[in-house]
Amino acid sequence: MPVDTSQRLAKLRELMKERHVDVYLIPSEDSHQSEYIAPCDARRAFISGFTGSAGCAIVSMSKAALSTDGRYFNQAAKQLDENWLLLKRGMENVPTWQEWTAEQAEGGKVVGVDPSLITAAEARKLSDTIKDTGGSLVGVPDNLVDLVWGGDRPARPREKVMVHPIEFAGQSFEEKITDLRKELTKKKRAGMVISMLDEIAWLYNLRGADIPFNPVFFAYAIVTHSTAELFVDEAKLTQAVKEHLGDKVALRPYESIFESLKLLSQAAASNGDEGHQKFLLSDKASWSLNLALGGEEKVEEVRSPIADAKAVKNAVELEGTRACHIRDGAALTEYFAWLENELINKKTVLNEVNASDKLAQIRSKHKDFVGLSFDTISSTGPNAAIIHYRAERGNCPNIDPNAVYLCDSGAQYLDGTTDTTRTLHFGKPTEMEKKAYTLVLKGLISIDTAVFPKGTTGYAIDAFARQHLWRNGLDYLHGTGHGVGSYLNVHEGPMGIGTRVQYAETPITAGNVLSDEPGYYEDGNFGIRIENIVVAKEVKTPHKFGDKPWIGFEHVTMTPLCQNLMDTSLLTAEEKKWVNDYHTEVWEKTKGFFNNDELTRNWLKRETQPI
């Protein structure tokens, strides 16, 4: 049932009127532009009732709209009440949220937004769009949704920060800072201000627990040619963390970042070298940070060099990625064997949450397990068509053994982050379900076996995954692959496989870890997605045109595919060989976990038989 947002919107409009704001924007992100956020920052969800991870809410004095992408069309339609208009991003004749905002601002109206929740680039672009219709954009320092939320708003987390040991990180934080300073020297810049939480955690080899599923902590950082600072609530730091940082990193209160930026900007202004007066700031940093540093005169907005460095995993991180995916594959195999036995042999009634709870319990037994990497998508039948479905405890259906079951799940281990999707059917699938599954599988294999010259982007290879669906007039409304962190965020940039502008600008590089996850969804009927994690690496080719290195992929996910859903007549001989080789690898790498578990071992052996 949708949440009744009438009173919340009425209170928000009262506050807008007091501050002379005609239209108010509520983005999804927090002040660090995080995709996944802490409960205290779920402002868009609070005001609209829509709980998906992506979207922007726009509220005028008489209307309210929610814009989101294809992953969430179904979910948003179910969760929004009658006060809201759903803007389906990317669909024909549907305005973007910026265009819709500009329409509401016609005739000199004022659009307000918390400047900490959008980037400077977004603010500039939006301001230009609004000006075209006669409106204007202003930053509103006090977040109006927070004022509506009042005392019911959850407290900001204060979880402890932990050291991420060199045995898992593979590189000391001192070396990472040295590399960043080389970048500053190369660009002739005074320093870099860092606000992305995963970048700070990676840079200083620290991890936290402030945001569910993401081992990060609220902080800012500043690195100059001679100093390194960490702005964090010091009560969260253990003695081990303080000893780890030693005298190489100065600790500052989290709240003091804006005052420090003003002082830093003033100090840089006295530097005689004009180039060294500017600071690097990620193009994902907030408008408020940009303004505090002095705006365009003092800031060079760049794609973060830390994001680029973090995305190329070192040898230790790659070995950890391989190892944790074997353990995680064993956990998923045990879960699927258990689930089939319960549903088919024991006739147990299990709902979607009962099942995902069991999976979490199985995972927790494995070495170096810390927690889940996102909320498990455990979906039966029509719910599998909701791309980012979330089963509600106490209000979700029982798993139907005669329908498709889609499970998208992952875990955080000290040595890596996992993300795997498998679609299964424990009964007799329809011909369309088998066809869809097999076309999706062909797409997964096409990415897995792709070879391309260095410098190729994920945008360029996205069609490899879709080609088999396209030939049948089918498609899916999400990207094909995203970067994956190393005991960090399960969604990581800057590279990925899809049609995002960012993916068109970022070549896939040896050492990148990405998902390979094509899908197909029929609303109200079923959904198919298969996801493996792959590591980009240099590969040998018979020839070397242009004397360039060539890039291919190594899959690290070790979980059986669903033979019951395959229409093998649609697979080529090469594709059948790939499936058989993959299943042989899964069997060899995971069978040792089940020497004392006959049920799972037998299931694994059956599921990895040649096709």
UniProtKB/Swiss-Prot annotation:
Its cofactor is Mn(2+). Mn(2+) 1 binds at D419, E517, E531. GO terms for biological process: proteolysis. Keywords: Aminopeptidase, Hydrolase, Manganese, Metal-binding, Metalloprotease, Protease. Mn(2+) 2 binds at D408, D419, E531. Signal peptide: none annotated. Coiled coil: none annotated. PROSITE patterns: PROLINE_PEPTIDASE (PS00491). It comes from the Eukaryota. It is an enzyme of class 3 (hydrolase). One of its GO terms (cellular component) is cytoplasm. Binds 2 manganese ions per subunit. It catalyses: Release of any N-terminal amino acid, including proline, that is linked to proline, even from a dipeptide or tripeptide. CDD domains: APP. Its EC number is 3.4.11.9. Catalyzes the removal of a penultimate prolyl residue from the N-termini of peptides. Belongs to the peptidase M24B family. This is Probable Xaa-Pro aminopeptidase P. The lineage of its organism: Eukaryota, Fungi, Dikarya, Ascomycota, Pezizomycotina.
